[in-house]
Design a protein with these regions (language model features):
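Carbohydrate-active catalytic/glycan-binding domains of CAZyme proteins
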Residues: 1-337
């Protein structure tokens, strides 16, 4: 399978990729070396700004343009550090960058910055999105124009601080059956316990999805859990190597919704499929085997008549896990038939 390192002159990761006009835009996080200690909370991932890259033509061959810094942590009034993953969506000719960063209390939230152009620069809102938490936003625009944000990441991403509230048993039919009750108690658990030892036979902690407001600046509803189920329709367990850990991505093909994600400490990218944006999503397959480096994070896009997987690894940095490099590879169309 052909692959390519997209931007070998700098360390970037966590690519969110979209086609605006006839050009493909890549919104990565921007890795840097700070000497911070390695830990399970990701303290060594000290990113402070975002760039945008773009190309036109075959991603395996086309020249990649770096449009420079589009947002720096010093521009964001509420954020102190760790500008982790981000994504961009277009609505009515404006571009909305949704990003994750830590506030001055050490808590991750999602923020929004706005631009008139896909290459930025982006102007941040003064405050984070009300009720937002954790990391790794993916912003998906459905065919009817509704915009959804998928988010969440365990361990350093703090998702384990939050617990879903009572929801109906997952059903593979009908958009309205899942998440009809408030799905999360907003705000960190009082003791902020990092439960890294969830029993293997307990349901896996889910990511979340929320519909965005018409102005794309706030949540329009309470976040709902994204439930991934097995072939019997049962939620995946915490001990399943295919359960969710971080790095949500959503795309649509042939009328179906494909939720892909990283499994974290089992180091896989996996694919699940559902019939509506809220899920549940039935586990389908592994997309990518473990790469060099601890994390694996991606996006999937159709461009130039093919499906492409954008991701990262740590081969160029000799396996320094917080210095990652962007890659691209084609995917088989049969995955989404």
């Amino acid at each position: 399978m052909e692959t390519r390192y997209l931007f070998p002159s700098d360390y970037m990761a966590d690519p969110s990729v979209h086609v605006f006009g006839n050009r493909l835009y890549i919104y990565p996080s921007h890795d840097r070396e700070t000497g911070a200690a390695f830990d399970d909370d990701g303290g060594h991932f000290q990113m402070r700004d975002y760039h945008v890259l773009s190309l036109s033509g075959n991603p395996l061959e086309a020249e990649v343009t770096d449009h420079g810094v589009i947002l720096d942590v010093d521009q964001v009034p509420w954020a102190e550090k760790q500008m982790w993953d981000n994504d961009v969506v277009e609505k009515n000719g404006r571009y909305y960058l949704i990003f994750s960063a830590k506030d001055y209390n050490g808590v991750f939230h999602l923020g929004v910055a706005v631009s008139e152009r896909p290459e930025g620069p982006f102007i941040p809102q003064e405050h984070p999105i009300r009720g937002s938490f954790s990391i790794d936003p993916c912003v998906f625009k459905d065919d009817d124009g509704e915009i959804y944000c998928y988010f969440g990441g365990l361990w350093g991403g703090q998702l384990q601080w939050y617990r879903p509230g009572p929801t109906p048993k997952p059903s593979l039919e009908g958009r309205g059956e899942v998440g009809s009750e408030p799905a999360v108690s907003l705000g960190p658990a009082p003791d902020k316990v990092t439960d890294l030892l969830c029993p293997a036979d307990a349901p896996a902690l889910p990511s979340f999805v929320v519909r965005m407001s018409d102005d794309v600046l706030q949540f329009a509803e309470a976040p709902r859990p994204v439930i991934i189920v097995d072939e019997k329709g049962e939620p995946l367990k915490a001990g399943d190597p295919h359960r969710f850990f971080e790095a949500s991505w959503m795309h649509k093909a042939n009328g179906r919704y494909y939720f892909s994600y990283s499994t974290g400490d089992s180091h896989l990218l996996c694919l699940a499929v559902g019939d509506n944006p809220y899920g549940p999503f039935r586990f389908k397959c592994e997309l990518l085997q473990p790469v060099v480096g601890w994390t694996t994070h991606h996006s999937i896009v159709r461009y130039e008549g093919r499906w492409w997987l954008f991701h990262h690894d740590c081969v160029p940095s000799n396996d320094i896990t917080h210095l990652r490099s962007l890659k691209v590879m084609p995917l088989d169309d049969k995955l989404f038939e």
